């Protein structure tokens, strides 16, 4: 625990908690409440001028790229650390968070946002709101290039740097560029849906499929679903491609939502699963809970196959739609999805109204070496870091989350014998934990203290099953899984705890409590109905 001017490495709590408040190997911080003030967050105003004033000239500048779980939580942890400004320790640095979006997205609750069970302000609050009680600055721009002040090339050809540098950022509206100076840099840009690489390319997918990875994707799906309500046809079909967590959760949420929504009760959902396999990384208990829920959804069918191509249907499109398969889709477009099954036979899904795409995520990084000087893993394209999350060869740059991969050196009698890259799961849980370590290590680097190796502690997995049901897989065995309404409540509480700020927790928690207090009998009836529904489905 950071408890004195002569700070030591964080204590390693031994008590495990599903909510993550105490974790083996997780740094424990004490908030710096002495210097807290209203943040100078701004989406438009230049901030570099402030950093050149005499007041701030000597302060270190920490720039965090990416405002997802890794980047935002790292910036908040840096702000909460104790910066004592005595005994040789450095004063609190200027922390700047840069992201191209105006809002943070709590991705595990995207499903509730899609089905209108939660509001946008609950799932996607603005950065300005989240940072208003911190000293973290926010700039809404896109990072396009990183220019270290100095780069040396070793005899082996490896690039190294021990200095700060500049990030070139671009305004999406004006296309104007600006240079942001950093002494220390954190890269946490997350993942994007890849439609174009040789590995993930599927003809027609980029033009006709809707990815499920961001706030705009959710809004586009809602718009298409509203349009589906108005379609007067006997058969309406929604395809969900991918049967990992995102695909299974999305399919179940849509199925349970459509069952009770007028105008959508006749929609059929097709879940396309490679080799017919569901939730490859889930436990036995988690897979069983998902299969049970999927099996009870009368409007949902699981299909074995991989998508080979998507084309505009020539016989099912409305009269307002062109039959040209290469043109952009409109709200009336019908699609044909061509599948290759595990036995190499073919199947075609005809006249599909909407195709939801949950596969093909890749690191969100520039591909040009001149724009992005860091070494990247050949297989995944992710930035290579050591165990402390420090980027290989760059003493003042750290990376975490979906855009990084750790490379471990196996040693025998003190000598490095081999290298092995360890890819952590691309989940919010990993980024949530890594943010603590990254913030601590930035503090340590600034104050010339030892860095702490990141050790991920798996705390189990949670998934929604739709309509106030969920499954929680505990990290104590393959069968230890809780599902149903109780798991739904536990999942809600866990995510409430993991909200980025206390203000956001209070905002959401008070709203849930207010809804219960306003109509307690309806709440009790809803719980009883959920339990009875779950019991009848078992």
Task: Give the residues covered by each predicted segment.
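N-terminal chloroplast transit peptides
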Residues: 1-32
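FAD-binding core/adjacent interface of flavoenzyme oxidoreductases
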Residues: 17, 34-35, 47-55, 59, ...
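Beta1-alpha1 glycine-rich phosphate/pyrophosphate-binding loop at the start
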Residues: 53-140, 201-205, 239, 249-284
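A Rossmann-like FAD-binding core segment of flavoenzymes
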Residues: 92, 133-167, 256-387, 393, ...
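FAD-site-proximal beta/loop scaffold in flavoenzymes
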Residues: 205-232, 319, 323, 350-433
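Rossmann-like dinucleotide-binding core of oxidoreductases
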Residues: 222, 234-293, 300-301, 424-445, ...
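C-terminal, flexible cofactor-proximal segment of oxidoreductases
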Residues: 434-538
